[in-house]
Amino acid sequence: YLFYPKPVLNVGLIRGTTVDTHGNLTFEEESINSEALSLAMAVKQCGGIVIAQAKYKAAAGTIHPRTVHVPGIFIDYVVINEDIHTHQQNEASAYNPAMAGNIKADLAEFPKLPLTEAKVIARRAAMELKKGTSINLGIGIPQNIASVVNEEKCGKYVTLTSESGTVGGVAITGKAFGNCWNPECFLDEDVQFTWYCGGGLGAAFLGLAETDERGNVNVSKFGPRFNG
């Protein structure tokens, strides 16, 4: 087995949508939960400080407790940022309510992928999907499987998930990958991985940099360039 020494965390940086004057943080316009709650708890247990960025400020007692994702006891400092350019929902969108689960996008209007080698691979992979299973899609060509599932209208038979915590809906390709259209649920990222590690997936389609004839996979070293 591998032993990982406990890291000492001094500062945690998290963000949400609304924070009240007691520091309670909500995520109603966010497209993922990430690991904000676990990160804040870990930093506080190490005696560090947690700084939360939010878009809106509310008076204490005006936020419904069910919508609070990170309680104020885990937050030390708050930064209110109303600039959409530095508080984007994700890399591709300042704010899209369909990614946050606040409306349902009309998936029938989404353009189909052009017939390329990548789509052929995605279509072949989609043939391996089994009814009633949960699926994890990785970055790269695997993300096109979501478009194929939507195009073939078979999303009701499988549940697509992402490592960032989305459950259901249709995974988004491109710069907003990790988010999805019309999600059914948002899990914290660490909770999602608990489900994965426990064997909850029916299949996983993952991206890679290179592989060999024995199935060994390289996902981190891309020639002379550092990943990140």
List each language-model region with its residue ranges.
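Gly/Pro-rich active-site capping loops and adjacent beta-alpha segments
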Residues: L201, E210-G228
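Ligand-binding beta-strand-loop-alpha-helix segment within the catalytic cores
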Residues: Y1, E163-T211
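Metallocofactor- and cofactor-centric catalytic cores in central/energy metabolism, strongly enriched
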Residues: Y1-E152, Y157-T161, T166, N182-F186, ...
